Amino acid sequence: MKHNVILVVLDGLNYEVARHALGHLQAYVGAGRAALYKLECELPALSRPLYECILTGVAPIDSGIVHNNVSRLSNQRSIYHYASDAGLVTAAAAYHWVSELYNRSPFVAARDRHTDDPTLPIQHGHFYWNDHYPDSHLFADAESLRLRHAPNFLLIHPMNIDDAGHK
């Protein structure tokens, strides 16, 4: 990897709202230091199936992760597996479903909330399980991972946008 990658997944954020409201990120895009992509959503349009789809490239119907209650390790190779196999450092500050898909399932908070294990696909992680976990805390978690481990691939997955959309 020539450059480290930070993937920010803003579940539930409309593309046009993102283009309008995320001026700081748009400045990075304009400077050629970031990218903004409009994705065509796979079906079903549910969170866990789409996390699996984004991180593996495999459609939900093919991965078997077809609803939010499928709680098991993925049977697909994810970006975490490819990065780890290439000797790269991986990290995530994300909802616990990501940990369940790629590290261990079921998620056990005392064991899995703070992950620091080079043998796991997601080697370093801070995982949360409350939908209303503050985004400010999540971004602080991500920055801690970035500073401490300098990951080549870091997923940042805040939940407050999606949580607000369900209320």
Each predicted region: which residue ranges?
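A short, flexible beta-alpha/helix-coil linker loop
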Residues: 13, 61, 161-164
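DG-centered beta-turn motif at the end of beta-strands
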Residues: 10-13, 83, 159
